[in-house]
C-alpha cells in the first residue's frame, strides 16, 4: 500500500511539473495581437516617464512586433524597418522618449497630441501613446506593407479613441486633413516616412501646417551628420543620396530656409554620421 501511494505521489508531482513547463509554451502560442491588446488595457500603475513605464513600453513593443511577424514572415526583426530595430540598441527610442519626457514646454500641457508620418508596425505610435495617460496619436501611412492595416487595427483595439490613422500618400493625406481640420495642432510631430529629399521636404512643410512655431516638438529620423544639416559639408551625404542622405538633405534645406532649428541628435554606436534621430522646432 505504501509503495502504491509513493508511485501515485510521484505521478502527481510529475504531472504538476509538466503543467508548469507547458505554461510558457501556451503563452507563446497565444495570438500575439491579443496578448498586446490585453496588456495595453491593463490599468497603468506606474508614473508617466518612469523606468517602470519604459519597461511596459518595451514589453508592449515586443508583443506588437511578434504580432506583425505572425502576419508576415517578412517582418523579420522585432523592430523591423523602425526606430525599435535591434541594430540600433535602443539609442533612437531612448532619445525620443527622453525628448518628450524632459521637454519643459510639453510638461506644461495637460495632454499631448502626437502626429506621425510613418506608422509601419505601430511601435513608435505605442511609444507616444504610453508617454502619458491622455496622449493621442494621429498617424499617416502609405499602407503598402502586408502588416500595416492589421497592426493599425490592433493598436486601435488597445487604445480606442486615443489612436487614429489615415492611409494613403502623405503628400495628399496630410494636406487633405489640414484643409478639413484647420484648428487641429500637433504638440509633437515625428517624421519617418519616405526617405527621398523631395518627399521629406514636403512632409516637413505639410506637418508645419499642423504645428505651432516655437512650440511643437519635431522629431525626425535618418539624420546623417549635424554638420550637413546645419549648412556645412554635405559631401558624404550627397554621395549617399539614394538612401538616408536624401532625408538629411531635406533637413539641410529646412534649416537653410529658416523653417526649423535643430536642437539635438543621437546616433547608435557605430552609426555616427550615418543614421541618427533628432529633435527640432519649427522657426517659421
Identify the role of each PLM range.
Residues 4, 23-190, 194-284:
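A short alpha-helical cap/connector motif
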Residues 11-25:
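N-terminal signal peptide
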Amino acid at each position: 500500500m505504501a509503495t502504491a501511494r509513493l508511485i501515485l505521489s510521484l505521478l502527481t508531482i510529475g504531472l504538476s511539473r509538466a503543467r508548469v513547463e507547458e505554461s510558457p509554451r501556451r503563452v507563446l502560442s497565444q495570438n500575439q495581437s491579443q496578448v498586446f491588446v490585453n496588456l495595453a488595457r491593463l490599468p497603468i500603475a506606474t508614473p508617466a516617464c518612469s523606468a517602470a513605464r519604459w519597461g511596459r513600453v518595451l514589453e508592449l513593443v515586443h508583443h506588437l512586433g511578434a504580432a506583425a511577424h505572425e502576419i508576415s514572415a517578412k517582418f523579420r526583426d522585432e523592430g523591423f524597418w523602425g526606430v525599435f530595430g535591434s541594430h540600433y540598441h535602443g539609442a533612437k527610442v531612448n532619445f525620443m522618449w527622453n525628448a518628450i519626457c524632459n521637454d519643459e514646454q510639453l510638461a506644461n500641457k495637460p495632454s499631448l497630441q502626437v502626429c506621425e508620418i510613418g506608422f509601419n508596425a505601430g511601435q513608435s505610435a505605442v511609444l507616444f501613446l504610453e508617454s502619458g495617460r491622455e496622449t493621442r496619436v494621429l498617424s499617416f501611412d502609405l499602407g503598402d506593407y502586408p502588416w500595416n492595416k492589421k497592426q493599425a487595427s490592433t493598436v486601435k483595439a488597445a487604445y480606442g479613441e486615443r489612436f487614429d490613422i489615415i492611409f494613403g500618400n502623405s503628400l495628399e493625406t496630410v494636406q487633405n486633413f489640414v484643409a478639413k481640420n484647420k484648428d487641429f495642432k500637433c504638440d509633437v510631430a515625428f517624421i519617418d516616412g519616405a526617405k527621398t529629399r523631395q518627399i521629406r521636404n514636403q512632409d516637413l512643410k505639410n506637418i508645419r501646417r499642423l504645428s505651432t512655431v516655437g512650440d511643437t516638438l519635431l522629431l525626425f529620423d535618418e539624420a546623417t551628420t549635424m554638420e550637413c544639416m546645419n549648412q556645412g559639408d554635405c559631401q558624404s551625404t550627397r554621395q549617399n543620396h539614394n538612401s538616408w542622405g536624401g532625408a538629411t538633405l531635406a533637413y539641410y534645406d529646412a534649416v537653410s530656409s529658416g523653417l526649423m532649428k535643430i536642437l539635438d541628435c543621437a546616433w547608435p554606436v557605430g552609426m555616427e554620421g550615418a543614421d541618427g534621430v533628432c529633435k527640432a522646432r519649427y522657426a517659421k
